[in-house]
Amino acid sequence: VLEELGIEVVAVTDAQSDAVKEVDQLETALALNPDALLSMPYDVEVTKAAYQKYIDAEIPVVFMENASADFTAGEDYVAVTNSDSYGNGMFAAMLLAESIGYEGKVAMVYYDADFFTTNERDRGFRETIEKYYPDIEIVAESGFTSIDVVGTVADGLFAQYPDIDGVYASWDIPATSVITSARAIGREDLKVTGVDLGDDSTYMIADQDMYVGASCPKAVETGKIEGYALACALIGKEIPTYLCSSVQPVSYDNVLEAYKSCFGIDAPDAVKEAWEAHQ
């Protein structure tokens, strides 16, 4: 979208979920004198001062997924763009409920941080289970603050609830760590759901493995919304301060179509081969 509109991208950064690193990257990018900023704050408090420098310089800011702390929409920043985070959690709950026969005990392994996207996913999962599946009990909610500790968190969960039927994780990477821990104690029958489609998690869905399904944001759709929001910011066009794209449930039955819908490209060959092996 940005290329089509003739907008030059002067910097692309990836802080890899490290808020301190993100602050350094934001300050480096500011030195390039950009006309607008599109950014996702990993920690709303840690990054606040860095974003304030853009606001003080009257550089329009469009946030992705999460707004930094204490800023006012439409005044300090243009808008927040996001996928339907609550819907992601809802679909993950529906998929997990179906996979365990609509009864049993499940747990949540969630990202324990002030991060709107995952907070809403988790709320969507919890409220959907509690409202629509009376025979399913959420017996534990185990939080993590770093991907590196998910395995340890999962080990503790399984030690306390060795016969649990299913686990929801805030996204697919911690879900794979949960699966690794479950395999280590012989729980290949455990059902796991989450959000997002990485190559590993997509393969597991196609292979009818322990990751039985996920909800997936439509990345192409979300990217277009972000691009147009940034363009509107550059020309001073007023837009809604919250822009949301759609999501979809993904299971074995639709994983190939869903992957293309989400990312705009065909699923990797390995995923196709795994899916075809079960036909």
Predicted regions and their residues:
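A residue-level marker of the well-folded mature domains of exported/periplasmic proteins
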Residues: 1-279
